[in-house]
From Swiss-Prot:
Gene transcribed to yield this protein: rpo11
Catalyzed reaction equations: RNA(n) + a ribonucleoside 5'-triphosphate = RNA(n+1) + diphosphate
Function noted in UniProt: DNA-dependent RNA polymerase (RNAP) catalyzes the transcription of DNA into RNA using the four ribonucleoside triphosphates as substrates.
GO biological process, one term: DNA-templated transcription
One Gene Ontology term, aspect cellular component: DNA-directed RNA polymerase complex
Database matches in Pfam families: RNA_pol_L_2
Cell compartments where the protein resides: Cytoplasm
Source taxon at top rank: Archaea
Species classification: Archaea, Methanobacteriati, Methanobacteriota, Methanomada group, Methanococci
The protein's name in its UniProt record: DNA-directed RNA polymerase subunit Rpo11
MF (Gene Ontology): DNA binding; DNA-directed RNA polymerase activity; protein dimerization activity
Organism: Methanococcus maripaludis (strain C7 / ATCC BAA-1331)
UniProt similarity note: Belongs to the archaeal Rpo11/eukaryotic RPB11/RPC19 RNA polymerase subunit family.
Keywords, ordered alphabetically: Cytoplasm, DNA-directed RNA polymerase, Nucleotidyltransferase, Transcription, Transferase
Length: 96
């Protein structure tokens, strides 16, 4: 089973679904995307979550939407944002 499903994709727009997740990662990705040059819209939506009896977490399948200007490739910006998040996590691990 995939963790990420691409729902729609073009040069300047991408919408993806995170399977069995909550607000945490979606919100982080959105915030980093909003700091990127060429991003017109970065948002996410979460339908009503359900309680996972195994983990005690409320989960859903959040969708992340990214729209860029015509000069900016949406997939490239998304990959840059994800790399920035990984770099931040690695930096934090080194400092602990």
């Amino acid at each position: 089973m995939n963790y990420v499903n691409i729902l729609e994709k073009s040069k300047n727009f991408i919408e993806l679904e995170l399977v069995n997740d909550d607000h945490s990662l979606s919100n982080l990705i959105k915030e980093v995307l909003l700091s990127k040059k060429g991003v017109i819209l970065a948002s996410y939506g979460v339908e009503h979550p359900v309680l996972d009896p195994d983990t005690g977490r409320y989960i859903s399948n959040p969708t992340i939407m990214l729209k860029t200007d015509e000069k900016t490739d949406a997939e490239k910006v998304l990959k840059e944002a994800l790399k920035d998040i990984v770099d931040l996590c690695n930096k934090t691990l080194k400092e602990l």
